[in-house]
Amino acid sequence: MEPAFGEVNQLGGVFVNGRPLPNAIRLRIVELAQLGIRPCDISRQLRVSHGCVSKILARYNETGSILPGAIGGSKPRVTTPTVVKHIRTYKQRDPGIFAWEIRDRLLADGVCDKYNVPSVSSISRILRNKIGNLAQQAHYDSYKQHQPAPQPALPYNHIYSYPSPITAAAAKVPTPPGVPAIPGSVAMPRTWPSSHSVTDILGIRSITDQVSDSSPYHSPKVEEWSSLGRNNFPAAAPHAVNGLEKGALEQETKYSQAPNGLPAVGSFVSASSMAPYPTPAQVSPYMTYSAAPSGYVAGHGWQHAGSTPLSPHNCDIPASLAFKGMQAAREGSHSVTASAL
């Protein structure tokens, strides 16, 4: 019986798209063909398409079967465990062997015949999926056997220190006599990794430490600079004035010439005995000054009562000093006088 659902072809017959023709109709087509009826007449009589009738009759003449589907069924399995074992053996003996060479060896060794030998693509798939991991593991094991033993890592403890120029400088310091020698690993100064402080970033601490290690005298570090005051410095010697050697200054005064019209004074007064400068009097820039030095030196209102025109603060001026400022003022007074005239 024909199914109650489907589509109607051009002859009025009903069929289901994608489904094979029922076996009863197939058998009827073959019987009518054996009676000598033409395929076109069978198609009109059974209301089946001409192409379907021709295909069924052609398959029956070739195979003798009216059943649908692939003729002879699927191909039997060729990748048997025995074949896989032989392929693994070939690959282990020669890791660089090709798939087509394995196929030829399977035929030469009689493992397979020309009907059940696997194809080149099947052998490649077996090598990739089933034997590839084993080959890589064997290669890795052989590589580990030939690989030399790794060197032991350096111990990181309180004895180990980072290489730095300070360690090289400390290694050159000889050991004092009478003191037992210390091994080099213990004698090296310990320098920890640099922190994020300003002194460590700029390298000030390492520089001061290196100077203190190489110098026989005590050198204060950066941390000690803030605690140092003027009281910590030694006082000047009696024969030194303001931190300078008096003998050297007197030697310079022998070869220096005093300015014309100015007396030579050879003594010094400490800065603590000098009075502070009072506020200078306002002087008009258009006033006319005399060319004589005593004219503009004695005219200032801030001159001390017991001082001389050359030393208004009651202190002596060394003869080695050149009165360039007074000479410049003297020349400036001449220019102002000339411009005013």
From Swiss-Prot:
Sorted UniProt keywords = Developmental protein, DNA-binding, Nucleus, Paired box, Transcription, Transcription regulation
Q: Where is this region: Interaction with KDM5B?
A: 168-189
Q: Does the keyword Transcription apply?
A: yes
* Pfam families referenced in this protein's UniProt entry, alphabetically: PAX
Q: Which InterPro entries match?
A: Homeodomain-like_sf (IPR009057), PAIRED_DNA-bd_dom (IPR043182), Paired_dom (IPR001523), PAX_fam (IPR043565), WH-like_DNA-bd_sf (IPR036388)
Q: Which PROSITE patterns match?
A: PAIRED_1, PAIRED_2
Physiological role: Transcription factor required for normal development of thymus, parathyroid glands, ultimobranchial bodies, teeth, skeletal elements of skull and larynx as well as distal limbs.
Q: How does it assemble?
A: Interacts with KDM5B.
Its recorded name reads Paired box protein Pax-9
Q: Which gene encodes it?
A: PAX9
